[in-house]
Design a protein with these regions (language model features):
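Non-catalytic substrate-recognition/targeting regions of SAM-dependent transferases
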Residues: 1-31, 38
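Conserved class I S-adenosyl-L-methionine
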Residues: 52-63
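Conserved SAM-binding loop of SAM-dependent methyltransferases across substrates and taxa
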Residues: 64-76
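Conserved SAM-binding motif I beta-strand of class I
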Residues: 77-82
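S-adenosyl-L-methionine
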Residues: 84-128
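Mobile active-site "lid"/loop adjacent to the S-adenosyl-L-methionine
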Residues: 86-87, 107, 124-155
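Helix-to-beta-strand junctions that scaffold the AdoMet/dcAdoMet cofactor pocket
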Residues: 160-162
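C-terminal catalytic and target-recognition region of SAM-dependent MTase-like enzymes
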Residues: 164-222
Length: 222
């Protein structure tokens, strides 16, 4: 088995991803996320069509960048942030192999960056979050999902444009259900009852038709 290899995603967006064996037991992609990639591509395209401008999309905890590439394929100005320089470099390779360019790369703690953007009054038409259950920022900042998620979402609510915008939250922690994730987003952002909010599970289906649930998602469309 090779140490590294490339695959091509040809769903709504079309891009290339380098896969490889790593010391942290990942291969560079979580394939169940394809449903989110297609959603991000569609929503970014819709916002661009409605506004006649390039949507600003922020991808937090962005890993190797498939969601960033999906937004970029739809014409967004993308900011890709992760606290691990190694995976940001990996994401940059994926951008180059995909024939894309001009993604903004940031190695920083997500909470710090989002808070600074809020203080500056910067707004994004798309925000994507895929936070881990536990983690550390580049300067030793500690992240624990069940303690930090609500505050993170409150801050994100301050930088998400009030109209013609979307949000995608993905959660892998076993302590969160789709209903709980949706409740956190609704309360943190102060959303009315009739908000266009959806949640559910992302699964992989085997050749026998059995579903393997792997994560939950919460999506908001404005």
């Amino acid at each position: 088995m090779p140490d590294q290899w490339w695959i091509r995603y040809d769903g709504g967006p079309k891009f290339s991803l380098r896969l490889g064996l790593t010391s942290f037991k990942h291969v560079g992609v979580f394939p169940e996320q394809a449903a989110n990639w297609d959603y991000i591509f569609r929503q970014t395209s819709d916002v661009a069509a409605k506004t006649g401008s390039r949507p600003k999309v922020l991808n937090l905890f962005a890993y190797t960048g498939a969601a960033s590439l999906a937004a970029k394929c739809a014409g967004a100005d993308v900011t890709h942030l992760d606290s691990v320089r190694q995976v940001v470099t990996w994401a940059h390779e994926n951008q180059d192999r995909s024939g894309l360019r001009d993604i903004r790369w940031v190695v920083e703690d997500a909470m710090k960056f989002a808070g600074r953007e809020a203080r500056r009054g910067n707004l994004y038409q798309g925000i994507i979050l895929d936070p881990p259950a536990y983690g550390h920022g580049p300067d030793g900042e500690k992240w624990k999902l069940d303690e930090c998620l609500f505050d993170m979402m409150k801050t994100v609510g301050k930088i998400l444009a009030p109209e013609n915008s979307f949000l995608v939250l993905n959660l892998y922690s076993n302590g969160f259900s789709a209903i709980l994730g949706e409740t956190v987003v609704r309360q943190a952002l102060g959303l009315p009852a009739d908000s266009s909010l959806e949640s559910g599970e992302l699964v992989l289906r085997d050749r026998f038709g059995k579903n393997l649930p792997l994560s939950i998602f919460v999506r908001l469309k404005r």
